[in-house]
Design a protein with these regions (language model features):
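Outer-membrane beta-barrel translocator/channel fold
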Residues: 1, 43-107, 115, 194-224
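Outer membrane beta-barrel transmembrane domains
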Residues: 116, 121-151, 169-180, 184, ...
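Extracellular loop and loop/strand-boundary signature of outer-membrane beta-barrel proteins
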Residues: 15-19, 30-34, 79-85, 94-96, ...
Length: 224
């Protein structure tokens, strides 16, 4: 469900989304606000979304039965004994600020800053590490991303070039770089083609093991 409204230079929007799978339920709500400035050559925007998910695990030998997946935390009595966490709810807050600027008749530039705060189970309940133990990820993840793009039109050639770049970092120690190049071509008045190349690279999380093996006392484990 999506609602949008416009009043002069202001634009306001909101949405609600519900989705469900056999072992997952998700509800999301969001708001967006934008304003145009300087004869519509500049647009400032802000967005916020909240997601409330519930994770479950299907029991392999009991058809139709699922149990809440609450991740795992070390027992207070024995750090090698992992017990269920406090909840199967994953709450995610996403917020972003955007800036678009028409610099010339043929050049548009954009800049966006995004932040997210996720709390709750975030691993795959069915996946195990190499030595057979369940995945265990931190219950909290905070991420910040910065992205920029430009779109340059070549009217005589009916082409537009669109370079993009995105960088993100989180408190798991993951850093990502994603440069991208898009080419838009108007072949016919009613036909346009687009070619895209994207390169993506990231480092591993701080708790990742290059061998895939973990000790029983390791607080976090991942099979990625």
């Amino acid at each position: 469900l999506r609602v949008a409204s416009r009043l002069r230079e202001w634009s306001l929007g909101s949405f609600f989304r519900y989705s469900t799978e056999t072992d997952y339920e998700s509800r999301s709500v969001g708001l967006s606000l934008a304003r145009e400035l300087r004869q519509k050559t500049i647009t400032l925007g802000a967005n916020y979304a909240y997601t409330h998910d519930r994770a479950f695990r299907i029991l392999a030998n009991v058809p139709g039965v699922r149990i809440p997946w609450k991740s795992k935390v070390p027992s207070e009595d024995d750090p090698t004994d992992f017990v269920d966490g406090p909840t199967n709810v994953l709450q995610v807050h996403n917020a972003s600020l955007g800036y678009n600027h028409v610099l010339t008749r043929t050049l548009l530039a954009s800049l966006q800053v995004e932040g997210s705060h996720a709390r709750g189970p975030q691993e795959n309940p069915y996946r195990r590490v190499r030595n057979g133990m369940e995945e265990v990820h931190p219950l909290l993840r905070r991420r910040l991303a910065v992205s920029g793009s430009a779109r340059y039109a070549i009217p005589k050639a009916r082409l537009a070039l669109e370079p993009r770049y995105r960088f993100s970092a989180d408190d798991w120690g993951v850093r990502t770089h994603a440069p991208q190049l898009r080419l838009h071509a108007r072949v016919l008045p009613e036909l346009s083609l687009r070619a895209r190349y994207r390169y993506y690279i990231q480092n591993a999380a701080e708790f990742w093991s290059p061998t895939g093996d973990y000790a029983a006392t390791d607080r976090y484990r991942t099979a990625d």
